[in-house]
Amino acid sequence: MSTLGSTCFTEEQEALVVKSWSVMKKNSAELGLKLFLKIFEIAPSAQKLFSFLRDSKVPLEENPKLKPHAMSVFVMTCESAAQLRKAGKVTVRESTLKKLGATHYKYGVVNEHFEVTKFALLDTIKEAVPEMWSPEMKNAWTQAYDQLVGAIKSEMKPSSS
């Protein structure tokens, strides 16, 4: 497990994240795809980071590899957020973090990509649970996302394998 400490992720923030994630979980494939479509709408050049999208003539929403990838990213992000306070840190296995860091490094992911993703994630969550959305919920998800990204960035170096 990563040992990056959590900077006061409160019980209230945890409750907001857990409550919204429990509603979104059943639609994670659809919401993950929405997240990535938003990312590519904001930053079309980000598509070049994905080998399976580079030469694809298929519309993004029909790409057979995008939906499973998008769902796994969305689920990992949300599960990590939901467990942040209880665990006291980002709960992605260290081997997974190292792999995520190395992959993001290899493909040239930069801070702006993480910022675009954060904006798209918050927008996706806001649309998924509009009746729950509040400034407090936005702050809770922002803090959880920032901690996950911090953990990934700490591993962004060339792969040792």
Curated annotation (Swiss-Prot):
<dbReference type="GO" id="GO:0020037">
    <property type="term" value="F:heme binding"/>
</dbReference>
<dbReference type="Pfam" id="PF00042">
    <property type="entry name" value="Globin"/>
</dbReference>
<dbReference type="GO" id="GO:0009744">
    <property type="term" value="P:response to sucrose"/>
</dbReference>
<dbReference type="GO" id="GO:0006809">
    <property type="term" value="P:nitric oxide biosynthetic process"/>
</dbReference>
<dbReference type="GO" id="GO:0046872">
    <property type="term" value="F:metal ion binding"/>
</dbReference>
<feature type="site" description="Homodimerization">
    <location>
        <position position="138"/>
    </location>
</feature>
<dbReference type="InterPro" id="IPR019824">
    <property type="entry name" value="Leghaemoglobin_Fe_BS"/>
</dbReference>
<feature type="short sequence motif" description="Homodimerization">
    <location>
        <begin position="111"/>
        <end position="123"/>
    </location>
</feature>
<dbReference type="InterPro" id="IPR000971">
    <property type="entry name" value="Globin"/>
</dbReference>
<keyword id="KW-0408">Iron</keyword>
<dbReference type="GO" id="GO:0071731">
    <property type="term" value="P:response to nitric oxide"/>
</dbReference>
<dbReference type="GO" id="GO:0009737">
    <property type="term" value="P:response to abscisic acid"/>
</dbReference>
<dbReference type="InterPro" id="IPR009050">
    <property type="entry name" value="Globin-like_sf"/>
</dbReference>
<dbReference type="GO" id="GO:0009609">
    <property type="term" value="P:response to symbiotic bacterium"/>
</dbReference>
<feature type="binding site" description="distal binding residue">
    <location>
        <position position="69"/>
    </location>
    <ligand>
        <name>heme b</name>
    </ligand>
</feature>
<dbReference type="GO" id="GO:0001666">
    <property type="term" value="P:response to hypoxia"/>
</dbReference>
<feature type="domain" description="Globin">
    <location>
        <begin position="8"/>
        <end position="157"/>
    </location>
</feature>
<feature type="binding site">
    <location>
        <position position="99"/>
    </location>
    <ligand>
        <name>heme b</name>
    </ligand>
</feature>
<keyword id="KW-0813">Transport</keyword>
<feature type="binding site">
    <location>
        <position position="65"/>
    </location>
    <ligand>
        <name>heme b</name>
    </ligand>
</feature>
<feature type="binding site">
    <location>
        <position position="51"/>
    </location>
    <ligand>
        <name>heme b</name>
    </ligand>
</feature>
<dbReference type="GO" id="GO:0016491">
    <property type="term" value="F:oxidoreductase activity"/>
</dbReference>
<dbReference type="GO" id="GO:0009735">
    <property type="term" value="P:response to cytokinin"/>
</dbReference>
<dbReference type="GO" id="GO:0019825">
    <property type="term" value="F:oxygen binding"/>
</dbReference>
<comment type="similarity">
    <text>Belongs to the plant globin family.</text>
</comment>
<keyword id="KW-0349">Heme</keyword>
<dbReference type="InterPro" id="IPR012292">
    <property type="entry name" value="Globin/Proto"/>
</dbReference>
<feature type="short sequence motif" description="Homodimerization">
    <location>
        <begin position="41"/>
        <end position="45"/>
    </location>
</feature>
<comment type="subunit">
    <text>Homodimer.</text>
</comment>
<feature type="binding site" description="proximal binding residue">
    <location>
        <position position="104"/>
    </location>
    <ligand>
        <name>heme b</name>
    </ligand>
</feature>
<dbReference type="GO" id="GO:0005344">
    <property type="term" value="F:oxygen carrier activity"/>
</dbReference>
<dbReference type="GO" id="GO:0036377">
    <property type="term" value="P:arbuscular mycorrhizal association"/>
</dbReference>
<protein>
    <recommendedName>
        <fullName>Anaerobic nitrite reductase Glb1-1</fullName>
        <ecNumber>1.7.2.-</ecNumber>
    </recommendedName>
</protein>
<dbReference type="GO" id="GO:0009409">
    <property type="term" value="P:response to cold"/>
</dbReference>
<keyword id="KW-0561">Oxygen transport</keyword>
<dbReference type="InterPro" id="IPR001032">
    <property type="entry name" value="Leghaemoglobin-like"/>
</dbReference>
<keyword id="KW-0479">Metal-binding</keyword>
<dbReference type="GO" id="GO:0009610">
    <property type="term" value="P:response to symbiotic fungus"/>
</dbReference>
<dbReference type="GO" id="GO:0009723">
    <property type="term" value="P:response to ethylene"/>
</dbReference>
<feature type="binding site">
    <location>
        <position position="103"/>
    </location>
    <ligand>
        <name>heme b</name>
    </ligand>
</feature>
<dbReference type="GO" id="GO:0009877">
    <property type="term" value="P:nodulation"/>
</dbReference>
<keyword id="KW-0560">Oxidoreductase</keyword>
